[in-house]
């Protein structure tokens, strides 16, 4: 679930036997701490290890370790989930890290505008010491990310003018 409605998460966990998986990257720790079974996170595609740490720590009743991992992830989550749709930012970052061949997304999504890309990059500059993530290798390619998945044809993607 990725609605961002904590009271709804609580209701589902209290009133059903459903296994609840958090899909709200910002609230994964709170959801796990009240009984969510796991997570499906966009940001985990960029840095999976801290999420494993959070899940294991919650399962071991070690809130301090889970909280430390959550806090370390905050600027990365902000970079991925705030300025453009998460899939757009995740592909932009993964391509900049050399992990995928193209940052292009399927229409109707389009790559980040210059200002959005700059905001993503500014937030990434605040990320420090996340296990499995080396941002010193980050080389963003704003031109490759522009537009949608189709060639730049009038009416289908952003035009140059």
Language model features with spans:
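Catalytic alpha/beta core domains of metabolic enzymes, predominantly
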Residues: 1-74, 78-82
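Conserved short secondary-structure transition element at the edge of the structured enzyme core
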Residues: 32, 74-107
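Short alpha-helix boundary/capping motifs
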Residues: 40, 58-60, 94, 101, ...
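Alpha-helical structural motif
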Residues: 50, 69-72, 86, 116-123
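Flexible, glycine/charged-enriched surface loops at secondary-structure junctions
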Residues: 63, 67, 84-89, 130-139
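Flexible C-terminal active-site loop/helix
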Residues: 99-137, 160
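Basic/polar N-terminal segments that are highly enriched at the extreme N-terminus
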Residues: 135-161
């Amino acid at each position: 679930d990725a609605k961002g409605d904590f009271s709804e998460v609580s209701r589902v966990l209290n009133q059903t036997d459903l296994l609840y998986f958090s899909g709200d990257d910002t609230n994964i720790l709170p959801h796990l701490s009240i009984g969510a079974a796991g997570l499906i996170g966009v940001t985990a595609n960029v840095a999976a290890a801290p999420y494993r740490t959070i899940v294991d720590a919650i399962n071991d009743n070690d809130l301090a370790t889970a909280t430390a991992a959550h806090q370390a992830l905050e600027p990365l989550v902000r970079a991925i989930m705030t300025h453009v749709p998460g899939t757009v930012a995740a592909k932009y970052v993964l391509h900049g890290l050399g992990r995928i061949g193209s940052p292009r997304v399927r229409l109707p999504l389009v790559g980040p505008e210059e200002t959005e890309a700059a905001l993503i990059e500014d937030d990434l500059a605040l990320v420090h010491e996340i296990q499995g993530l080396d941002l010193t290798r980050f080389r963003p390619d704003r031109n490759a990310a522009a537009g949608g998945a189709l060639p730049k044809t009038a009416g289908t993607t952003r035009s140059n003018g």
